[in-house]
């Protein structure tokens, strides 16, 4: 199995599985994220349907890493940001996201509160959110904005 051209720099084939591996040492792939080290320390184990165990970031840490990525490579127009799309996906399809924050790391929660507060001040945030929702779900824009407000108000 080989990776297609244009695959992300973090994509690898491991034991015949395609995986994205994000190192917390910037010397490995040339960059890192301020949240990778903590996210790796708090990783969660999942077992795939084929019996293989994998480790993933918890949702709050995943969103924090994506927020850092948007700031680093999202540019001024987030309608085109894949990282912002990932954040919107989590906020749209994980109704318990705010509950997962209530018992989490205080530093992480404060970071998320500040970042979502800043996001809500963006002049085009409604359009940016709507552009990242699946076709036909633009009515979810207000819901997503309310989730962001809920995070800020924790």
Regions found by a protein language model. Name each.
Residues 1-154:
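Compositionally biased terminal segments of proteins
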